[in-house]
Amino acid sequence: MSAIVLNEKMEKASELALPESFSGINPHNLYLYVKSAQAAMRANSASALTRAEVRGGGKKPWAQKGGGRARAGSRRSPVFVGGGKAFGPKNNRNYDLKVNKKQKKLALNFALNEHAQKGSLFIVDSIEIASGKTKDAATLFKALNQRDTLFVKTVLDEKTYLAFENIASTYVIEENELNAYLAANYRSLVIEKAVWENLVGEAK
């Protein structure tokens, strides 16, 4: 598998072979990381009151016998409107899933290898919009001729960030923000050469 090296005009200049360590990775590593990332994003805000937490209803609503109705001990029972919820959600649940460092790295390498197979992994010398204008970023993105693209810079400067901010199908991040979830979530990746060299170095 190879990554496509682009020139300043976003045209193909050459190809760069991926290290052997990027191939033969179990896809389950990516599954575990994505599941962990999605679990971390859960708001965990749903919470219902149990019969012990609902206010009022301490008095027995009617006599045990003689009324012809089913016996009831409290208006807080789940069978009544306004009563507590049986087996309802609580916001004290921990959804975190642990993924170790090795699995995180394998997941990212697998995602990069998948992009290389699809021809959607691109390497450039630099990603920089010095003017800070969205128009210039859009021109660069249009020349790339890709959809839903993740740009990865060594260090993200403010002007480049602002230039891409209003282009809905792009996202620019720094090297330390790159992870398997983001890599798998975009149709194509454009990575600065310095970032790519670091990724390859860590894979050895």
UniProtKB/Swiss-Prot annotation:
The keyword Ribosomal protein applies. The keyword Acetylation does not apply. It comes from the Bacteria. One of its GO terms (molecular function) is rRNA binding. One of its GO terms (biological process) is translation. Keywords: Ribonucleoprotein, Ribosomal protein, RNA-binding, rRNA-binding. SUPFAM superfamilies: Ribosomal protein L4. InterPro entries: Ribosomal_uL4, Ribosomal_uL4-like, Ribosomal_uL4_dom_sf. GO terms for cellular component: ribonucleoprotein complex; ribosome. Residues 52-76 are annotated as: Disordered. One of the primary rRNA binding proteins, this protein initially binds near the 5'-end of the 23S rRNA. It is important during the early stages of 50S assembly. It makes multiple contacts with different domains of the 23S rRNA in the assembled 50S subunit and ribosome. Belongs to the universal ribosomal protein uL4 family. NCBIfam families: rplD_bact. Part of the 50S ribosomal subunit. HAMAP family: Ribosomal_uL4_B. PANTHER family: 50S RIBOSOMAL PROTEIN L4, LARGE RIBOSOMAL SUBUNIT PROTEIN UL4M. This is Large ribosomal subunit protein uL4. It comes from Sulfurimonas denitrificans (strain ATCC 33889 / DSM 1251). The gene is rplD.
